[in-house]
Amino acid sequence: MASTGSQASDKNKIFGFFNDGEPPTKKPRKLLPSLKTKKPRELVLVIGTGISAAVAPQVPALKSWKGLIQALLDAAIDFDLLEDEESKKFQKCLHEDKNLVHVAHDLIQKLSPRTSNVRSTFFKDCLYEVFDDLESKMEDSGKQLLQSVLHLMENGALVLTTNFDNLLELYAADQGKQLESLDLTDEKKVLEWAQEKRKLSVLHIHGVYTNPSGIVLHPAGYQNVLRNTEVMREIQKLYENKSFLFLGCGWTVDDTTFQALFLEAVKHKSDLEHFMLVRRGDVDEFKKLRENMLDKGIKVISYGNDYADLPEYFKRLTCEISTRGRSAGMAREGQLNGSSAAHGEIRGCST
């Protein structure tokens, strides 16, 4: 019985957040058995805009595509990069909810005019203005989410994101850990990531703002990867053989980039098991999402009724998964090296 108490104590101490001795105000949501029994190395974490918005809620550009385009447009106007008529045209398109990918593409082209063989870098300036000083804008509950992601990463999970920001990399650096940002322009590194040779790398499938030339909004922008059969085979094997865990993603599976990379080759697979954590919110919308995702092998799981429920839920899930993964690893090690290895500390689940 003593070991059970010790395990519970370890789990409660996992990251140091929400460990003030206060009893929980409501009964925590149960963890789905088929998810909590996964090991970190069996997971690919997919980070969507919902995570970035939770980490730095005061930055409108992190909340949605529309928010990002508006922020870029505002920066372009502030820097006198657009004529009045041009800015009005872009504002009108945003207001009318025109195709946002096309609007973003046109704005990027406008901010990156090519003269002879030289392309200006005004787009880069606008990006840096939009994402300026993200470190100071992170909130504690958001940092807890990033800490959970980083913990799973260090224990073998792969991470990809649809976001342009580098919040996870910034948080890791603050913890004294170095993560690499990858985009689809570097086929060699993408291949190595898919082969699990670059586990401490974050794959940004739309690019990352620190490398504007790697930003792509449509599959046409990374034909080099789509035409590389070796890279595509390794990428799609991940979706077939691992469990993707979607965090803050909503309708990410409708993203044309994500579909081209992962879904095209596995449309008719029936043995996929992926997971999506979402807020329950509107019951009808939740049911609709759950039904739609099941067709793609994705189980939609509610972490609670409020966005604020996610950090604590994901912390518990992370510790459960890490504990099982670490225990299995130490059991194997113990068989080889004697029983003492099996009694080592589970890193991250104790102080």
Swiss-Prot record:
Modified residues (N6-acetyllysine): 11
Modified residues (Phosphoserine): 9
InterPro entries from the UniProt entry: FAM118
Originating gene: Fam118b
Pfam assignment, any one: SIR2_2
Keyword DNA repair in record: no
Compartment annotation: Nucleus, Cajal body
Family, as annotated: Belongs to the FAM118 family.
GO MF annotation list: identical protein binding
GO cellular component: Cajal body
Superkingdom of source: Eukaryota
PANTHER family per UniProt: PROTEIN FAM118B
Residues bearing PTM N-acetylalanine: 2
UniProt-recorded name of the protein: Protein FAM118B
Function: May play a role in Cajal bodies formation.
Keywords recorded for this protein, A-Z: Acetylation, Nucleus, Phosphoprotein
Region of interest called Disordered, as start-end residue ranges on this chain: 1-32, 330-351
